[in-house]
């Protein structure tokens, strides 16, 4: 009985340290994330004019804060600055081939930013048939994002970012 408690306590302590290490893992810098996205672009080899747009946050808490701000700003002032920057990368996709590689370490922030950017770009152009969107995120795109990309007539390719070292 005492051995079981000791094993259980040791396992709980190990789990606590693993969770602490995961929570404290620092996200890649903007330069590192940009390099990762360019490496993924080289691997995928999308056709068209290549544009790389990183979606980054200082920490998981910063990502949640940006999501909350985007929701409030979206209702009052339109899309966030990150979404507007990404929407500019989609320009010309209604008539030319454009490959946009975008993403970052936080799935929810990636998803919201890309959906907002697509909505913003589709206000100008109903269809963006020349767009290949390489979505780099820890989680697969949601059905809502897939539907938005399909409505735009664009191609969606998902890749997961490399694990932090």
Residue ranges and their predicted role:
Residues 1-24:
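Sec-dependent bacterial lipoprotein signal peptides
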Residues 24-87:
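N-terminal, charge-rich interaction modules
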Residues 7-8, 50-55, 98, 131, ...:
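Hydrophobic transmembrane signal anchors and adjacent membrane-proximal interface regions, especially
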Residues 132-165:
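C-terminal partner/receptor-binding element of secreted or periplasmic proteins
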Residues 30-32, 54-60, 100-107, 133-139, ...:
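Structural motif
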Residues 64-132:
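Mature extracytoplasmic domains of secretory-pathway proteins
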């Amino acid at each position: 009985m005492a051995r079981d408690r000791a094993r259980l306590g040791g396992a709980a302590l190990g789990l606590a340290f693993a969770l602490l290490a995961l929570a404290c893992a620092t996200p890649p810098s903007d330069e590192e994330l940009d390099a990762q996205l360019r490496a993924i672009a080289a691997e995928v080899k999308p056709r068209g004019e290549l544009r790389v747009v990183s979606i980054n946050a200082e920490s998981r808490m910063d990502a949640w804060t940006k999501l909350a701000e985007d929701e409030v700003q979206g209702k009052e002032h339109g899309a966030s600055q990150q979404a507007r920057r990404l929407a500019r990368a989609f320009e010309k996709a209604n008539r030319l081939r454009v490959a946009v590689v975008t993403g970052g370490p936080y799935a929810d922030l990636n998803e919201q930013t890309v959906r907002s950017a697509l909505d913003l770009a589709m206000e100008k152009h109903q269809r963006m048939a020349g767009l290949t969107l390489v979505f780099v995120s820890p989680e697969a795109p949601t059905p809502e994002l897939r539907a938005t990309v399909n409505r735009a007539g664009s191609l969606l390719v998902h890749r997961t970012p490399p694990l932090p070292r």
